[in-house]
Amino acid sequence: MASQNITPSPTASSDSVFAHLVRAPEDPILGVTVAYNKDPSPIKLNLGVGAYRTEEGKPLVLDVVRRVERQLLNDMSRNKEYIPIVGLADFNKLSAKLIFGADSPAIQENRVTTVQGLSGTGSLRVGGEFLAKHYHQRIIYLPTPTWGNHTKVFNLAGLTVKTYRYYAPATRGLDFQGLLEDLGSAPSGSVVLLHACAHNPTGVDPTLEQWEQIRQLIRSKSLLPFFDSAYQGFASGSLDADAQPVRLFVADGGELLVAQSYAKNMGLYGERVGALSIVSKSADVSSRVESQLKLVIRPMYSSPPIHGASIVAAILKDRDLYNDWTIELKAMADRIINMRQQLFDALRARGTPGDWSHIIKQIGMFTFTGLNPEQVSILTKEYHIYLTSDGRISMAGLSSKTVPHLAHAIHAVVTRVA
């Protein structure tokens, strides 16, 4: 038979062409959930991944999101055609308005280019690749610490990653002097990654007065700010308050980038909905920026998905839906603030060694506990509490029922291991 004369492919041999590969380590954040899922303990607690949970420990789909999805389902005029490379026009326009403000001069002067992205991660990656191709300085400064994915995203985009001091372990607060010194010595034109609010993983944010000093330094050094806005409205409960740092930088007429995510504030984690906005000096430059962003996006994923962006656009453009969303958003933020207070009170009631006031001073989804890797390991092995090795816990994963268990465990490990 003809098939008997076919020369065997090299891949048909016993050794795979990929046999040289070593097993990659689990993602340090997502790996926490992998370990948690394998634990049969009935008291196990997952405080690793940044996803909101109800008081019952269940994932939450916002009521306003469910209502909009029903509307979309019943709209027979909708189809599943490709959308433009830059995404849904309404979504982009409304996303820019949400982060910059309805009266933003940059929007009114057509100096803002907004493209729909694959949540925050995808928006950061598109921004990073755009800068690597079209910006003269390929250095980006990240705070220490920062979200674990930032370094990989920007390295793979073609940028050189450097760091600036941010967190002060001794005070469990902001190392403001270190931040100013490091950015002050950065090469002119360097890109600076800034967490717009609710810094991940520390929960430590600059005050507005400190933000103004940061702005002055960045502008005086001709540095280019790149904001990561993953928690707008989720930090304080106010969409406008959480956008103030970004708006400070827009008000001075300078240029900047912002990546937005709707994972947290609309609970659309799995829909991968985000946006990248670039503020330029003129409408003409902004138009050219958009044309080049299309060339970054087209070979990467061609065009973004339609469903999640349609949900966001529907909520942002309808006054009643928008108001209902802000109520649900504030309820989520308030529950997290309440969990902070409960945990602080529980530790204080036990007389746990150390100052734990940082738990109620920090903001947003995460708390940087100050626990060291050895203490974290004991929490996991003996108390079935899962968190990242740097001591970051997701306050959204706590409930009134689980706070006592966590407080007892923290008290035990800090008493036993310094």
Swiss-Prot record:
It catalyses: L-aspartate + 2-oxoglutarate = oxaloacetate + L-glutamate. The modification N6-(pyridoxal phosphate)lysine is found at residue 264. It is found in: Cytoplasm. Pfam families: Aminotran_1_2. Its main location: cytoplasm. GO terms for biological process: amino acid metabolic process; biosynthetic process. Belongs to the class-I pyridoxal-phosphate-dependent aminotransferase family. This is Aspartate aminotransferase 1. It comes from Medicago sativa. The lineage of its organism: Eukaryota, Viridiplantae, Streptophyta, Embryophyta, Tracheophyta. The gene is AAT-1.
